[in-house]
Amino acid sequence: RSGLPRGIFGDIVAPGTVCGTLLPQVKEEVGALSAKVISVAAHDTGSAVVSVPAATDKFIFISSGTWSIMGTETKAPVVTDASQRHNFTNEGGYGNTIRFSKNITGLWLEQESRRQWEREGEKFTYPELTALAREAAPLRSFIDPDDARFSTPGNLPKRIAEYCAETNQPVPETKGEIVRCILESLAMKYRYTVDAIDEMCGERMPAINIVGGGTQEKLLSQYAANACGRDVYTGPVEATALGNIAAQLIALGEIKDLSEARDVIANSFEIEHFVPQDKAAWDAAYEKFVTLIKE
């Protein structure tokens, strides 16, 4: 225990609880009209998951950005040897749900590689890097995105090349080869995590919903569909903000419940659909990837 007095902390309340109204001095300071204060699904991932426009209550979500937070919603915590082995957590979500998920490295790998090239005097936009990756040879080399060497700032392209050399794979040399290696490796790690979720939940989740800023990397979304062998739906980009708003609208009675909120979001924003391709090639490459990360 910290020894801090309990009275200095606020009450713990469920997401969607109306906590009160703005104090008069706060309204005056910020120039606001009278407004209710409503708790939302915290933190940012909690609100992002509220906004997932899933067609059913059986889905896998990926909140995609610098990190990829992957998981599913359950009615009760999943506490098993397998969940501990796979490093999954159970967090309280909106509407008495459990956010059963884990963090894996995300587009940090591409972001930091881009910064390294900029330090070396070469500037690229993300669409330019994606175009280079499209031109590179497919399914050639893989890394474990969660290897500790990739977790700190620095020369990630060099570290990626060293990893591939150490694991007796073709060494990516061009910018396109490096970015393609990153994106394909992330997609493979998604499949590894998806398979673990299926195992722990005792059923095959039919689809994957990707939300957040990482949905703008459409090549990764297609690779995720290819690797996981299931349909991928992407959007909205501003998932956290929309989930925050949705929780407030439910609390105010403007939207019926979580299911209706997701329907509203699905019908209000462009949701892109990616269908699996090249199944045999990706399945064969996945076997290579699994061997690699288990060594």
Question: Where do the PLM segments sit?
Answer:
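Active-site core segments that coordinate phosphate-bearing ligands/cofactors
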Residues: R1, P24-A207, Q216-T240, A246-Q277, ...
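General small-molecule cofactor/ligand-binding pocket signal
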Residues: G7-V13, I38, Y233
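Short linear loop/turn motifs
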Residues: G10-V18, P127-L132
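Short Asp/Glu-rich motifs
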Residues: V18-C19, N244
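Divalent-metal (Mg2+/Mn2+/Ca2+)-assisted nucleotide/phosphate chemistry catalytic cores
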Residues: R1-R6, I12-P15, T21, E29
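Small/polar loops that bind or transfer phosphate-bearing groups
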Residues: A14, G212, P236
